[in-house]
A protein has these predicted regions:
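N-terminal Rossmann-like or analogous alpha/beta NTP/dinucleotide-binding catalytic cores
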Residues: 1-118, 219-220, 224-237
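C-terminal active-site "lid" helix and adjoining low-complexity regulatory extension at the edge
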Residues: 271
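Active-site cores that bind ATP or allylic diphosphates and position pyrophosphate for catalysis
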Residues: 105-257, 264-268
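Short linear Ser/Thr-Pro motifs
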Residues: 11, 257-259
Length: 271
């Protein structure tokens, strides 16, 4: 059995709950059993929602669980140069385009398309649906809007990306190779207007830079793995294997969330 490098990558936007404990213990145990490394990464790119207090609580909760991890701990907020370099590579490949749409405009367009005669609603895929409004703009229109200072995100042109990388697959432990399905993600945002990156870009770059060999995470993130595999191919990154574990639910069958304080690790620690 080869040594595995695994990671637990929480966001300091609330207290950890039992679902986080399961994920952390799951990744930690695999690393321990294989003589590998368990990494802790703080995913704090969204500085408006993250706090030092919640980050401190993460360390306290994981220590309370008896976990140890490699140091230093990577923090995404210090990694923006790496994300910018990745975006530059993607721009050079011609697979990014600026998106000037607001969320309200996107939702309105989706509703309009869904109600139009003889048209199908956009496919729901776990990422925000996007009707391709700004993909259809001319280069001149894009340049005019950008020059005038209109805020914009950067989206992946999924069709162009698929044409560049061709058929792909990733390995899901205990299931084997999975063919990448472009319909799982569409033209995803890779750089948000407010922070200049995204979860999808950052996590893909970070997993490669930290030489993670096995990404363990909840089954709710299985669809986005298709997008991450495309980004790996475009950026020439090493490809880890994946294991998407079941979600932890409460007695009513509802997925645990940070807003449920009664199931937070801090709640159990204080009892």
């Amino acid at each position: 059995m080869n040594p595995e490098t695994t990671r637990f990558a929480p966001s300091p936007t609330g207290y950890l709950h039992l679902g986080h404990a399961y994920s952390a213990l799951f990744a930690h145990d695999i690393a321990q059993k294989t003589g590998g490394q368990f990494l802790l990464r703080i995913e704090d790119i969204d500085i408006t929602r993250c706090s030092d207090a919640f980050e401190a609580a993460i360390f306290e909760d994981l220590a309370w669980l008896g976990l140890s991890w490699e140091t230093p701990v990577m923090r995404q907020n210090s990694r923006h140069p790496a994300y910018r370099a990745a975006l530059d590579t993607l721009e050079g490949l011609g697979v990014l385009y600026p998106c000037f749409c607001t969320r309200r405009e996107i939702n309105a367009e989706i509703e309009r398309a869904a109600s139009a005669p003889h048209s199908d609603a956009p496919h729901s895929n776990g990422l925000i649906d996007y009707p391709g409004t700004c993909r259809k703009l001319s280069d001149g229109e894009r340049q005019t809007r950008m020059a005038s200072g209109v805020e914009h995100a950067m989206r992946l042109d999924a069709e162009k990306a698929a044409g560049l990388v061709g058929p792909l697959e990733f390995v899901e432990r205990e299931r084997g190779p999975i063919a990448v399905d472009q319909n799982q993600f569409g033209d995803a945002v890779l750089a948000r207007k407010d922070i200049g990156t995204s979860y999808h870009l950052s996590v893909t770059v970070d997993d490669a830079d930290q030489s993670v060999t096995l990404v363990t995470r909840g089954i709710d993130l299985f669809p986005v793995t298709h997008l991450h595999r495309v980004l790996q191919a475009l950026l020439g990154l090493d490809v880890p294997e994946y294991y998407h574990h079941p979600m932890i639910e409460d007695s009513a069958g509802v997925r645990l969330a940070k807003r449920n304080d009664a199931l937070s690790l801090r709640h159990f620690r204080d009892q």
